[in-house]
Amino acid sequence: MTTIVSVRRNNKVVIAGDGQVSLGNTVMKGNARKVRRLYNNKVLAGFAGGTADAFTLFERFESKLQMHQGHLTKAAVELAKDWRSDRALRKLEALLAVADETASLIITGNGDVVQPENDLIAIGSGGAYAQAAATALLENTELDAREIAEKALNIAGDICVFTNHNHTIEELEIPAELPNLSQA
């Protein structure tokens, strides 16, 4: 599988992921890009799960973003509705972590949309390790979002055999006047 982590702190939100693609117990590729910018570079998205499935979801999610003028939550809910009702989509095995200036969300394979606590998302095979590491770093350091995501991925990569140290990191600056809706 893989590890994707998203951290929101101060005026930044980051989504980062490793590059390993595995088929069973074999590493097939080490430099896959599982984190992307969508909707005119205003939305970050990362996936864990089947690669082909994730690309299908990226395309569907981006079309929902276009349809809803970039409104992240509306697009995520509409994708989740499709995911639940479309027979082909229901068979897709992937998780999406998405974020923009205002919110961070997980879109699950069951068609659920979850807004996490503590401005932190960690999904995939190394997600629990990355979440534990990022939580400790958020609570006990002044590191910025990018540094926390990077360190959390490194720790997950040291522990999880399906996570490597070839990272893709995307970052958005959050304008100071925007409220942090995830703490509302």
Swiss-Prot record:
Gene Ontology CC terms: HslUV protease complex; proteasome core complex
Catalytic residues (positions): T2
Protein keywords: Allosteric enzyme, Cytoplasm, Hydrolase, Metal-binding, Protease, Sodium, Threonine protease
GO terms under biological process: proteolysis involved in protein catabolic process
Alphabetical list of SUPFAM superfamilies matching this protein: N-terminal nucleophile aminohydrolases (Ntn hydrolases)
Class of the enzyme per the UniProt entry, highest EC level: hydrolase
Regulation: Allosterically activated by HslU binding.
GO MF assignments: metal ion binding; threonine-type endopeptidase activity
EC number: 3.4.25.2
Annotated compartments: Cytoplasm
Recorded coiled-coil stretches: none
Positions annotated to bind Na(+): G157, C160, T163
Catalytic activity: ATP-dependent cleavage of peptide bonds with broad specificity
Role: Protease subunit of a proteasome-like degradation complex believed to be a general protein degrading machinery.
Assembly notes: A double ring-shaped homohexamer of HslV is capped on each side by a ring-shaped HslU homohexamer. The assembly of the HslU/HslV complex is dependent on binding of ATP.
Similarity comment text for this entry: Belongs to the peptidase T1B family. HslV subfamily.
Stated name of the protein: ATP-dependent protease subunit HslV
Gene: hslV
